[in-house]
């Protein structure tokens, strides 16, 4: 039933234009990803790709290749999970393989610094940093400053940085003018759509619930950040609405058929 749902979503919802401008495919298998061509901004998890793979993706006409990097939680499938399990802060709702982590811990900050360096050496163009939302769940000065420290270290790699989510942190950091020139863009998920995790389906977010993120993204734009939207399973009608909103505001969007971000269609 789920696979049928995904097929219908693609046939009715995703425009060809959004496929080429911006694609978030951090869950796509390496062999499939290496066949991707002509995408302006492509997001992958470069930990599972070699330097030669990144060169191949560039040769395929993919202009800007960003690597996913999880700065705010620890995933159980990472090779070094056991080394950092003792600084986990709590369960990550809807994602059984993840736990929020203490970003103020110097060992964690060193881990992220080292990962950023390794990814940079593979030839990526930028970082797609996830789970700054740890500050939403644990709003302490230590967690806030831990994220700032991590961003300052990543900035030394001289790569473009997009923050996925993290609105509570980003809002405060903009108020403090702490990320000017360090963070270049934000990606916001589910402005127009919503994920129903219990039955693995998607739906349209009620209009009255969209205002918060629209206001937040307007603030990000004013601050000088490039804005990206990542939506899930939008119908053809809703896709037109998303496209019009993004065109009015100078934003870029992707509409994924899968919460795992592992397929084009």
Put a short name on every predicted segment.
Residues 12-15:
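Membrane-interface motif at the C-terminal end of an N-terminal transmembrane signal
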Residues 2-10:
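Bacterial N-terminal signal peptides
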Residues 17-265:
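Glycan-processing catalytic domains of CAZymes
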């Amino acid at each position: 039933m789920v696979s049928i749902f995904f097929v219908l979503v693609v046939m009715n919802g995703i425009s060809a234009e959004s496929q080429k401008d911006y694609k978030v495919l951090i869950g796509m298998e390496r062999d499939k990803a290496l066949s991707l061509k002509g995408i302006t901004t492509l997001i992958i998890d470069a930990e599972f790709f070699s330097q030669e793979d990144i060169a191949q993706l560039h040769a395929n006409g993919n202009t800007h290749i960003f690597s996913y990097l999880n700065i705010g939680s620890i995933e159980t499938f990472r090779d070094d999970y056991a080394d950092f399990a003792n600084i986990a802060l709590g369960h990550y709702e809807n994602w059984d393989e993840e736990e929020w982590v203490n970003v103020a811990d110097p060992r964690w900050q060193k881990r992220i610094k080292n990962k950023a360096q390794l990814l940079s050496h593979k030839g990526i163009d930028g970082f797609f940093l996830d789970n700054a939302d740890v500050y939403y769940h644990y709003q302490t000065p230590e967690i806030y400053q831990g994220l700032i420290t991590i961003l300052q270290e990543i900035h030394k790699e001289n790569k473009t940085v997009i923050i996925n989510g993290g609105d509570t942190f980003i809002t405060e950091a903009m108020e403090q003018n702490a990320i000017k020139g360090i963070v270049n863009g934000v990606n916001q998920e589910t402005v127009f759509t919503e994920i129903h995790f219990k039955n693995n389906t998607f739906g349209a977010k009620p209009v009255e619930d969209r205002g918060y993120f629209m206001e937040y993204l307007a603030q990000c734009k004013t601050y000088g950040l490039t804005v990206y939207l990542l939506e899930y399973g939008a119908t053809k009608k809703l896709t037109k609405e998303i496209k019009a909103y993004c065109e009015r505001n100078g934003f870029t969007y992707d509409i994924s058929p899968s919460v795992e971000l592992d397929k084009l269609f």
